[in-house]
Amino acid sequence: MTKSVFTDRYHLFTQMLIQERCDKELTQVQLAEKLQKPQSYVSKYENGERRLDIVEFLEIADCIGIDAAEFIKKLQA
């Protein structure tokens, strides 16, 4: 059995981030510009090609305009 670093909870985490981005009517390009990263950065974490660390998550939450603590509470619910 192969182990994956991408658990069901991590998949939910990325799906919630995508939903938050879409709720704020931000495209991947617009978010990438706010992050000062290429669009492929956003695409890769949204598609599970790369994993985010906590600092990256906090930067993304800031740029999307969401409260990181509230987001984590929703993820834990």
Regions found by a protein language model. Give the residues of each.
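DNA major-groove recognition helix of helix-turn-helix/homeodomain DNA-binding modules
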Residues: 55-70
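Short basic helix-loop element that most often maps to the first helix and adjoining turn
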Residues: 15-34, 59
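Short, charged recognition helix plus adjacent turn
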Residues: 1-7, 70-77
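Key DNA-contact positions within bacterial/archaeal DNA-binding proteins
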Residues: 29, 40, 69
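A short, Lys/Arg-rich alpha-helix, primarily the initiator
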Residues: 1-23
